[in-house]
A protein has these predicted regions:
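C-terminal capping alpha-helices of c-type cytochrome domains
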Residues: 21, 41, 98-100, 105-106, ...
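Long, ordered, helix-rich scaffold segments
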Residues: 377-383, 390-832, 850, 857, ...
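Inter-heme linker and motif-flanking segments adjacent to c-type heme-binding CXXCH motifs
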Residues: 119, 159-164, 186-188, 317-318, ...
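Axial heme c-ligation environment in periplasmic c-type cytochrome domains
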Residues: 747-749, 753, 767-794, 848-855, ...
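Generic beta-strand/beta-sheet core signal
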Residues: 154, 192, 203, 211, ...
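Beta-propeller domains with acidic blade repeats across secreted/periplasmic ectodomains
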Residues: 1-411, 422, 430-433, 502-503, ...
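C-type cytochrome heme c attachment motif
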Residues: 280-281, 351, 385-386, 461, ...
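Sec/Tat-exported extracytoplasmic proteins
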Residues: 130, 286, 312, 391, ...
């Protein structure tokens, strides 16, 4: 479409207006933008995208950094210069000190125009060594100035061996996939939490968010150095999944575009259409030109489905949750399948800017099966591109020129209070670039008396300028605004070892009303190895121990004082049972990993002492067992915990006797329906550290379909921990397997395939037909047929080949040439679809819901579609297996498992009717080994009719 036609095809949420501010030929293949202090826009143009199919560098680097300007102030850019050319795949740009940083792997470049002609005459490699061994869309990107004056970048799911040409004396930083940051003034480079793909943003309070293709919003909660203080802490997570992800991350496109997954035969039962498959450019809007109340909204671009989603961000403990602002309809969507939003930004005018790469296809050819590549033109649109501006409708756009280049220090400091986030960030950047230490007095006044924005920016600017004083931080930690206290604690962390004043001011904040403040107090205490920390950390743990982030922060800061922490934790006011159990489990893991055998035996004896009611004890022992496992003391016949208590000493004998008694009680707790779920789960985990002879019967009972799925899955994992062969065999016993729901089956397969000693048990079950070969799915068969153990590999190959040459496969292979020889007619194919398929399957919005929606398979090769018609059991979509449930009133219900809850399951029968069944009413539940789709449908149709049906299913394809 022309730029005007493309603009007309956009549908934006009511209350907003959208304007086209730049289009080809002014911009081409834009993927990122940045505004400098004069309001000029730098555009990273990735014209050479995608890289060659065979990998390696592009034949001729085509990337450009364009400098575009609005010369007449009408809000539309009208002049361009090629600021820098000959770049491979530039994918990020950020203004700094009169020039720009550009991410163009393997290098981070600095480009600057020193003579004012609009062309960079200075080009310097700041950092180098970022990997280029993966496709162009999986490389480091998004240079973004953080509140601390460092520039943050996403990993692009990639790594490198990064060095600084200006500082050859510095050691290389090697990593496989981690986000990073560098100091633009010193060139220091270090890794940070998160593994973002193509998207990085900060909120007004300085918190960092990233994204990946199937993960629209992640919040970076912790940083790796904060977790390294305690080497025995088994916690490595740094990000919280804020939004729904994967198949749950819904989008509502108005176009009919394709996703790469639609072309992969092994994914035909799990199409990505209707879910985020290319989330990028995650952006928290901090401008003032959107409708009132929209500050802090999260925007995510979805280029594969031609839309931008707006989500609402809500606090969730120390982190956040988000949800689509409108269910069923997007913030911005286009009917034009070439609309490819990839990057979002705050503008100088407070508006939201959207970068549209505008391509026919946006993907890498290596991700598309070879037979389907001919349907794509990966370079079509490389000379096009559009940039849009969105603001509140009915509000006059800001037209005042922006030029902070000559602004005085006084003006810049005053700007730190403005509601426009871009202006605040730019003012802070300029103060840092100028090393404006003379502004310390003004900044100090602002940090004490400004609004929230001003206080936060002033604090971090003083820190970057090295003029921040301890009393500034103390004042911030006592501020009435929670976010100011939070940032005050963050600033205090690295100063604590040298500042008793800060330490004393920090202690009362252990009882702060804000969870994020308490989180950072716990983290800050880890910066100083002081025994006084322990009581404070115990206070936080008793209040917040159920939160995994706060628990990890506390235990990281405990360092090597686990015994002292245990004493302080149990000596204080009683914590809630759930809190006590969670803390004691992780604390037990620390003891098991680090303490001597004698100390661990003493803990087993103490915890296993007789009590009236079990609550936290199983959790603590399960944690201890997990810690012991890391020491490699388990034998082929015994778990690490049982090995510990089997020593030939009086201490071990006492511990063993007490543990045996507690194990019996743990089994009773696990079976008790009304007991708290977390206590039952801990008890089940502990049973998995015992012996099959003592725990097996209880764990098998927990696999019954009457039990909640979460209980069944916990039992599966526990059985997988037991060392005896009969334990694993119990998981794949045919009658039991048939009763499992898909969720439980998946857990069984995951557990059995996780240990080499258990794989043979699974292969035995497949060989005896107790488990259908198709139940494993293609990906698991690929793992087995590539197994490192030759015996397993050869046996798996034999079983898989037997399945591939069975009767149904022979029928398929016989029919395939004849069907493909016909030219199918989509119009004629509607009749067999209506006759045989529509009752169970939806296609293009019409049909039943018993089977999978077929709308997403229209791009599959004809041979793959024929395979599923002739051989419906070849691959059964998880969730569409047939189940037979006998219930207490004598009825038998057959259908697919539509959903399951802790206390019930719902089946949808062949007529489309749903049946909700309380688990306690289930007498038996059995899964069929075959698909709900009847075999032999191909026998009712001629080869020509099959070709017509396939053509109909593919009728919406390009």
């Amino acid at each position: 479409m022309s730029p005007a036609e493309a603009l007309a095809s956009l549908v934006v949420e009511p209350g907003y207006r959208i304007d086209l501010v730049a289009a080809e030929p002014l911009v081409q293949s834009p993927v990122a933008i940045a505004f400098d202090e004069r309001g000029r826009m730098y555009v990273a143009e990735n014209r050479g995208y995608p890289d060659p199919l065979e990998g390696g560098p592009a034949a001729a680097p085509q990337g450009v950094i364009a400098l575009v300007t609005d010369t007449d102030g009408d809000g539309h850019y009208d002049r361009r210069s090629d600021f820098a050319t000959g770049l491979t795949y530039p994918n990020g740009v950020m203004a700094w000190d009169g020039g720009v940083f550009v991410t163009v792997a393997p290098d981070l470049l600095y480009l600057k125009d020193t003579n004012g002609d609009g062309v960079a005459d200075q080009r310097r490699v700041v950092l180098t060594g970022f990997n280029t061994n993966r496709t162009a869309q999986i490389r480091f990107s998004h240079p973004t100035l953080g509140p601390d004056g460092w520039i943050y970048m996403t990993a692009g799911l990639n790594g490198g061996r990064v060095t600084s040409p200006a500082h050859p004396e510095r050691r290389p930083v090697e990593f496989t996939s981690s986000d990073s940051r560098f100091n633009p003034r010193t060139g220091e480079f270090e890794l940070v939490g998160g593994q973002g793909q193509f998207g990085l943003t900060f909120d007004d309070q300085g918190r960092r968010f990233i994204c990946a293709n199937r993960n629209p919003v992640w919040h970076v909660v912790l940083e790796p150095p904060q977790l390294k203080r305690n080497p025995n802490l088994a916690f490595s997570e740094t990000v919280q999944e804020v939004s729904a992800a994967g198949a749950q991350a819904k989008v509502w496109p108005i176009s009919r575009d394709l996703t790469t997954a639609s072309f992969i035969p092994t994914m035909m039962n799990a199409p990505h259409v209707g879910t985020f498959t290319a989330a990028s450019g995650v952006h928290i809007h901090r401008g003032d030109a959107l409708p009132d109340g929209q500050r802090g909204s999260v925007f995510i671009a979805e280029s594969a489905q031609n839309l931008v989603q707006r989500q609402l961000l809500e606090s969730d403990g120390v982190s956040f949750r988000s949800r689509p602002a409108r269910d069923g309809v997007e913030f911005l969507a286009s009917r034009d399948t070439w609309f490819r939003p990839v990057f979002l930004a705050n503008g100088p005018d407070g508006a939201l800017y959207i970068v549209d790469m505008y391509r026919k296809d946006i993907d890498h050819p290596a991700y598309v099966p070879e037979p389907s590549r001919r349907l794509f033109d990966f370079t079509a649109g490389s000379s096009r591109g559009r940039i849009y501006r969105i603001a509140a409708s009915g509000r006059a756009p800001v037209r005042s020129p922006v030029d902070f280049a000559a602004a005085s220090v006084e003006v810049l400091v005053a700007t730190l209070e403005q509601p426009n986030g871009w202006r605040r960030d730019t003012a802070q950047r300029l103060l840092i670039e100028r090393n404006a230490q003379a502004a310390a007095g003004q900044l100090r006044s602002l940090s004490a008396a400004g609004n929230e924005f001003g206080r936060l920016h002033a604090l971090w600017t003083m820190d970057a300028l090295d003029v921040l004083r301890d009393d500034d931080i103390v004042r911030a930690m006592r501020d009435r605004i929670a976010s100011v206290r939070e940032n005050g604690v963050r600033l205090a962390e690295r100063r604590l070892p040298q500042s008793p004043q800060l330490f004393d001011a920090l202690i009362p904040l252990a009882n702060d009303t804000d969870a994020r403040v308490r989180l950072h107090v716990a983290l800050a205490l880890g910066a100083v190895d002081d025994p006084r920390n322990i009581d404070v950390l115990a206070t936080i743990a008793r209040r917040d121990g159920a939160d995994r982030w706060l628990r990890a922060a506390v235990l990281s800061s405990v360092r090597n004082r686990a015994s002292a922490f245990l004493d302080a934790f149990v000596a204080g006011p009683g914590a809630a049972p759930a809190v006590r159990g969670a803390v004691m489990q992780d604390l037990g893991r620390l003891f098991g990993a680090a303490e001597s055998a004698e100390q661990c035996l003493a803990i087993v004896t103490h915890i296993s002492a007789p009590v009236a009611e079990l609550s936290w004890q199983p959790a603590a022992l399960a944690g201890l067992a997990a810690g012991l496992r890391t020491r490699g003391i388990a034998s082929n016949a015994q778990s690490a915990l049982m090995t510990l208590v089997s020593a030939d000493t009086v201490q071990a004998r006492v511990a063993r006797e007490r543990l045996a008694t507690l194990m019996v009680r743990a089994g009773q707790l696990a079976l008790r329906q009304g007991a708290p779920a977390e206590q039952r789960l801990s008890a089940i985990e502990l049973l998995g550290q015992g012996e099959w002879s003592a725990s097996g019967n209880t764990l098998v009972r927990l696999l019954e379909p009457q039990r909640e799925a979460v209980i069944q899955i916990a039992a599966v994992r526990a059985i997988g921990q037991l060392r005896e062969t009969q334990a694993a065999a119990s998981l794949v016993e045919p009658a039991r397997w048939q009763a499992y729901t898909p969720q439980v089956r998946d857990a069984v397969l995951t557990v059995v395939l996780s240990e080499e000693r258990l794989v043979s048990v699974l292969l035995d079950a497949v060989a005896s037909r107790g488990i259908s070969a198709s139940a494993l799915g293609a990906s698991r068969w690929r793992r087995l047929t590539a197994h490192r153990n030759p015996a397993i590999r050869q046996r798996a190959e034999a079983l898989y080949n037997a399945e591939e040459t069975g009767t149904a496969m022979q029928v398929y292979q016989r029919k395939l040439p004849d069907v493909l020889a016909h030219t199918g007619d989509p119009a004629r194919g509607a009749a067999p679809f209506t006759r045989y398929c529509v009752a169970c399957h939806t296609f293009n919005g019409t049909g039943g819901v018993v089977g999978p929606d077929l709308s997403g398979i229209r791009n599959q090769p004809a041979d793959a579609l024929l395979l599923h018609i002739v051989f419906p059991d070849y691959e059964i979509t998880p969730g569409y297996e047939a189940y037979t449930v006998q219930i207490g009133d004598g009825r038998t219900i057959v259908g697919r498992l539509e959903s399951e809850a802790p206390n019930s399951v719902t089946l949808r029968d062949g007529t489309g009717q749903s049946h909700a069944i309380v688990r306690t009413d289930i007498k038996s539940m059995t899964a069929a080994t075959s698909s709900l789709m009847p075999a032999g449908l191909d026998q009712t149709m001629s080869s020509g009719e099959l070709a017509d049906l396939i053509a109909y299913l593919k009728s919406a394809a390009r």
